[in-house]
């Protein structure tokens, strides 16, 4: 609502559940132009888009990491001149260096890499805060309101802010965001290598589009009639070994390994070893 303009479409790329929800909400405020979608292949890749097609839009919106389907933008696009780039970076902000200065507006829930749920980080270009052409919106939903009040327009989530502070101090002590990038690359490479070399396990996301944060996979190499039972057995045995929360999202099924910043490299090594041992017995 903050950037929408009457009679001017907003451009989106549909890469999964969270961008789909954003598109649906944006339609309450005006016309939406979907530049590309990978829905037909269950969002297993980032669709190829001609960014020039966003020319004349009120803004261009992308979801930079897609938790359910395990895809991630490697870089931010070049938005046409005069079209603000808006990014939802909720599920991978803080996982690697990002050229955030290329985005006019970005938002990220804290609950993945920055802290606990109930807190949202927003960064916005200053000229957009005082835009005279901004559409009317409830005061509490305007970014300018919160910026002018130093994020104290209403009582903030003080515990969430404290946890954010502690997490950022921890990240800095580990070597900063660059260190997080190295660790996350090591963890995800371990699992993707195991998946790509397996005749039982299969990654959902296509190579070249894969997320370092969430890695959905199936036991697609199992006979179709045995796949569900074998998946249930794998999840049960994994849980017994201490690997919790591996069940995939209900819209995709299968399994999903979450490897956010706090997940250690040792955990990735242990998981891949267990998967290889399970495949030998299956």
Q: Where are the regions that the model predicts?
A:
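Conserved PLP-anchoring active-site segment centered on the Schiff-base-forming lysine
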Residues: 5-20
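Conserved PLP-binding catalytic core of the aspartate aminotransferase-like
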Residues: 201-238
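Structural motif
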Residues: 11, 59-63, 86, 107, ...
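Active-site-proximal loop->helix
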Residues: 2, 21-31
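Active-site phosphate-binding strand-loop segment of PLP-dependent enzymes
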Residues: 26, 38-93
């Amino acid at each position: 609502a903050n950037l929408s303009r009457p009679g001017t479409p907003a451009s989106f790329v549909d890469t999964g559940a969270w961008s789909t929800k954003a598109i649906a909400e944006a339609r309450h405020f005006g016309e939406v132009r979907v530049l590309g979608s990978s829905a037909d292949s269950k969002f297993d890749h980032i669709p190829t888009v001609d960014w020039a097609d966003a020319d004349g839009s009120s803004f261009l919106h992308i979801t930079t990491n897609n938790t359910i389907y395990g895809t991630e933008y490697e870089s931010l696009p070049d938005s046409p001149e005069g079209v603000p780039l808006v990014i939802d970076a909720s599920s991978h902000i803080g996982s690697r260096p990002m050229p955030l200065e290329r985005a006019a507006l970005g938002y990220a829930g804290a609950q993945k890499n920055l802290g606990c749920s109930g807190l949202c980080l927003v960064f916005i270009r200053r000229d957009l805060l005082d835009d005279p052409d901004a559409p009317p919106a409830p005061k509490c939903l305007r970014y300018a309101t919160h910026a002018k009040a130093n994020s104290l327009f209403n009582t903030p989530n003080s515990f969430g802010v404290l946890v954010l502070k502690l997490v950022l101090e921890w990240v800095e002590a580990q070597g900063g965001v660059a260190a997080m990038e190295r660790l996350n690359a090591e963890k995800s490479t371990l699992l993707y290598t195991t998946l790509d070399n397996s005749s039982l396990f299969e990654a959902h996301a296509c190579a070249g589009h894969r997320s370092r944060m969430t890695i959905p996979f199936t036991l697609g190499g199992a006979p179709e009639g045995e796949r569900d039972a074998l998946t249930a057995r794998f999840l049960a045995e994994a849980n017994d070994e201490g690997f919790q929360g591996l069940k995939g999202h209900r819209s995709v099924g299968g399994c999903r390994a979450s490897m956010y910043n706090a997940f250690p490299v040792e955990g990735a090594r242990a998981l891949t070893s267990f998967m290889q041992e399970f495949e030998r017995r299956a």
